């Protein structure tokens, strides 16, 4: 597809029928880390304007821990996982109560969805979440999504809501993604450094790291940082969804298509949610090591991974689980969904289709990873 101009991207955002808005905890809190109701109300006001004009909004909101640690008597955000999860359990209800009150002033109902990374890794849970959000939007409700901090394991979690928001944008077939943070745009260097300047438009985010040096977040509240926001924008771009990154105070102008923050152009036509899920959300459970011939075929695109070209299988996984496909040097080539359990694969390695059919039966004469379930990385 031809890369759209900044003006075209901004117009597309303004005309978007469905928008996902992500706001981080640092944009909803006071310097002390406690929830700032005034900031929350201002954000809701901007969203309500779009909603009252007939647009659909999905709000991906952090802030459960920030809302909970004050009422529990903590002076600062807890650092150990168990206390964070307990605090999130208390804070999520308080956060939703504030949102319900704020949106209620505009006659808008809200619905809560708490999602873990594992929910996006399992096709059934993914479909259920997509179906629920579609129905909420059909009913005129604003879904408010957050990672389920109270249940998410430390090993498998988003750790921020940036990437989650991009997955949600693809899930609901959004027309735009707005990433709200505590800085007003992407800069060529940390904004505090001399000579740093704002980047108003990124036509191809895959080339971004050649022109931008990203510093760490200056916020002491959020856990995302700029890197995960860029990853979210990249996920949106490769899904065919334009994105805007800006400060929460600019939410209204960003939604209206004004030239605030940094706009990211989509880099390809909208792809399938399934392929985005495989590429970004699925957590690989194992590794299949391809020989040089198979690696070349995989790199060429649209080739299935056959047992004849696989040297080794590592990990414990079931058929349908996501796996890495590596070359012999250990480089990741692709992600895919395994066609067989890890226990079945060793007997298949190095055998062509005719041999597999003769020795093991027809049910083993299929690719280890079918090309429809394989995505290059």
UniProtKB/Swiss-Prot annotation:
It catalyses: L-glutamate + ATP = L-glutamyl 5-phosphate + ADP. Pfam families: AA_kinase, PUA. One of its GO terms (biological process) is L-proline biosynthetic process. InterPro entries: AceGlu_kinase-like_sf, Asp/Glu/Uridylate_kinase, G5K_ProB, Glu/AcGlu_kinase, Glu_5kinase, Glu_5kinase/COase_Synthase, Glutamate_5-kinase_CS, PUA. Residues 285-363 form the PUA domain. Pathway: Amino-acid biosynthesis; L-proline biosynthesis; L-glutamate 5-semialdehyde from L-glutamate: step 1/2. Substrate binds at residues 62, 149, 161. Its EC number is 2.7.2.11. Keywords: Amino-acid biosynthesis, ATP-binding, Cytoplasm, Kinase, Nucleotide-binding, Proline biosynthesis, Transferase. The keyword Zinc does not apply. Its main location: cytoplasm. Belongs to the glutamate 5-kinase family. This is Glutamate 5-kinase. It comes from Bifidobacterium animalis subsp. lactis (strain AD011). The gene is proB.
């Amino acid at each position: 597809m031809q890369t759209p101009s900044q003006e075209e991207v901004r117009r597309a955002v303004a005309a978007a029928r469905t928008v996902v808005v992500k706001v981080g905890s640092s944009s909803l809190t006071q310097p002390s880390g406690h929830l700032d109701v005034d900031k929350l109300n201002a954000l809701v006001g901007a969203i309500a304007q779009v909603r009252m004009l007939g647009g659909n909004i999905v709000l991906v909101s952090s802030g459960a821990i920030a809302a909970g640690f004050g009422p529990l008597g903590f002076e600062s955000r807890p650092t150990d996982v168990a206390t964070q999860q307990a605090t999130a359990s208390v804070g999520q209800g308080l956060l939703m109560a504030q949102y319900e009150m704020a949106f209620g002033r505009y006659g808008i109902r809200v619905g809560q969805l708490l999602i873990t990374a594992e929910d996006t890794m399992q096709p059934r849970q993914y479909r259920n979440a997509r179906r629920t959000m579609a129905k909420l939007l059909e009913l005129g409700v604003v879904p408010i999504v957050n990672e389920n901090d109270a249940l998410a394991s430390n090993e498998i979690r988003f750790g921020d809501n940036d990437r989650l928001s991009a997955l949600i944008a693809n899930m609901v077939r959004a027309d735009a993604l707005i990433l709200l943070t505590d800085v007003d745009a992407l800069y060529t260097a940390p904004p505090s450094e001399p000579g740093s300047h704002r980047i108003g438009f990124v036509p191809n985010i895959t080339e971004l790291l050649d022109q931008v040096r990203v510093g760490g977040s200056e916020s002491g509240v959020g856990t995302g940082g700029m890197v995960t926001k860029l990853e979210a924008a990249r996920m949106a771009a490769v899904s065919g969804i334009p994105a805007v990154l800006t400060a929460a105070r600019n939410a209204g102008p960003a939604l209206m298509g004004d030239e605030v923050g940094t706009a990211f152009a989509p880099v390809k036509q909208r792809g399938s949610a399934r392929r985005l899920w495989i590429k970004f959300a699925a957590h690989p459970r194992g590794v299949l090591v391809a020989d040089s011939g198979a690696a070349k075929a995989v790199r060429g695109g649209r080739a299935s991974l056959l047992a004849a070209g696989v040297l080794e299988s590592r990990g414990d996984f079931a058929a349908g689980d996501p796996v890495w496909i590596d070359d012999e040097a250990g480089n990741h080539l692709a992600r895919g969904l395994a066609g067989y359990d890890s226990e079945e694969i060793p007997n298949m390695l190095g055998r062509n289709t005719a041999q597999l059919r003769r020795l093991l039966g027809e049910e083993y004469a299929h690719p280890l990873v079918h090309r429809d379930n394989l995505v290059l990385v």
